[in-house]
Amino acid sequence: MSEAALSFHWSLDGFVRAYEAGAFDDQRVELIEGEIWPVVIGDWHGDAVGQLFALLPRVGVRLTNATLPTGNSLPDPDCWVRRADAAPIGSKGSRLSVWDPGDVLLVVEVSDETVIPDLSTKTRLYGSAGYPVYWVVTKERIFEHSGPTASGYRQRIEYGRGDRIPVGYAGVDLAVDDLI
């Protein structure tokens, strides 16, 4: 008898029902294109997220790390920025707000062990949702994606140590060394 690999893809509604029923209370997970991905926060990752929240400009915006419903996925970006006066345009279940992509000014993933999916799957996910700017922060550089398209982003710029990265929504730039 041979063994066959079984795979199961979650629907967004099915995942939300399970989430709201407490099925994942003892785990940090996110739903990405029908698959449940674990969310692991190590020391460097946690410190880098703290730096983002400390250094990103806050005038006229809200910084959060709430789940960001995106298409048929429920990613948990490490940080995202929305207009302070933005209102949700819908919801997924009773606890997750859906936002207009034009109100989401920056999405950030801090990548230690997740660089490949953050630069591939999540780049495609956030770009196709229409979020204007997406950063992937690693220990050595920040990848800035802009110009969202149906398959990702038109432009990717890498910023390394010693560089400054523009924060477009605020008209300022930050030292990469301070963020990584």
What are these regions (language model features)?
Residues 1-180:
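Gly/Pro/Ser/Thr-rich low-complexity, intrinsically disordered segments predominantly at protein N-termini
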